[in-house]
């Protein structure tokens, strides 16, 4: 019995070694098979995905290129239409501006010329006083810078002398000048008018002897 047991143990020992070797061979073969199958699956999946990705990238690049071209080079039709529409408007606006500037410039020149002529013009008023109250009207003309040519032929000697004294005093106050230009005529000028009278001999007749007032005192 003891010998039989030892024989069975030896048989079982060798049997387990064979089983282990078989199991190791099976596991190694399975390990080698699984990576090959995974590699085949991966290799088969990559060729399918790469064309799709390339196609998407090409579409995206084509769209981006079209957008950049459209931004850099706009359509000729729209630009020409805009130029044709904007060109007449700009031309009309320039013409209107030039007309306005020319008319305004002419108006300003006219106003300046009128103002200069009005300021440069000197009016000479001819007065024939008949009474003493007319002297105030003559002085009022001197205040507004007008020259007055006074003829006393219609006044008496006493009235003409009083009137002449009043006008002479007013001319001094207003910085004017009073000069005799005839036997019975005197020129009253404002300060901005200079009068140059040449000396001349005035003939004295019986009609105007009384009007040669005390002007020689001046």
Curated annotation (Swiss-Prot):
It is found in: Cytoplasm. It comes from the Bacteria. Residues 24-115 are annotated as: Disordered. InterPro entries: Cell_div_SepF (IPR023052), Cell_div_SepF/SepF-rel (IPR007561), SepF-like_sf (IPR038594). Gene3D superfamilies: SepF-like protein. Residues 47-63 have a biased composition (Basic and acidic residues). Keywords: Cell cycle, Cell division, Cytoplasm, Septation. One of its GO terms (cellular component) is cytoplasm. Residues 28-43 have a biased composition (Polar residues). One of its GO terms (biological process) is FtsZ-dependent cytokinesis. Cell division protein that is part of the divisome complex and is recruited early to the Z-ring. Probably stimulates Z-ring formation, perhaps through the cross-linking of FtsZ protofilaments. Its function overlaps with FtsA. Homodimer. Interacts with FtsZ. Belongs to the SepF family. This is Cell division protein SepF. The lineage of its organism: Bacteria, Bacillati, Bacillota, Bacilli, Lactobacillales.
């Amino acid at each position: 019995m003891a010998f039989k047991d030892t024989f069975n143990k030896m048989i079982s020992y060798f049997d387990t070694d064979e089983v282990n070797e078989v199991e190791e061979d099976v596991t190694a073969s399975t390990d080698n098979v699984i990576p090959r199958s995974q590699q085949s699956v991966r290799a088969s999946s990559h060729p399918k995905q790469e064309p799709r990705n390339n196609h998407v990238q090409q579409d995206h690049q084509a769209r981006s290129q079209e957008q950049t071209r459209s931004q850099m080079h706009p359509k000729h039709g729209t630009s020409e239409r805009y130029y044709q529409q904007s060109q007449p408007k700009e031309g009309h606006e320039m013409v209107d501006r030039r007309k306005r500037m020319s008319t305004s410039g002419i108006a300003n020149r006219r106003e300046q010329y009128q103002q200069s002529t009005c300021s440069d013009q000197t009016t000479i008023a001819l007065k024939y006083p008949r009474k003493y109250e007319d002297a105030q009207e003559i002085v009022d003309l001197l205040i507004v810078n007008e020259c007055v040519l006074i003829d006393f032929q219609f006044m008496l000697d006493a009235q003409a002398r009083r009137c002449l004294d009043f006008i002479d005093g007013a001319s001094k106050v207003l910085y004017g000048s009073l000069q005799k230009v005839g036997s019975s005529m005197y020129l009253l000028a404002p300060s901005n008018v200079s009068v140059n009278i040449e000396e001349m001999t005035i003939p004295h007749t019986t009609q105007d002897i009384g009007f040669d007032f005390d002007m020689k005192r001046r």
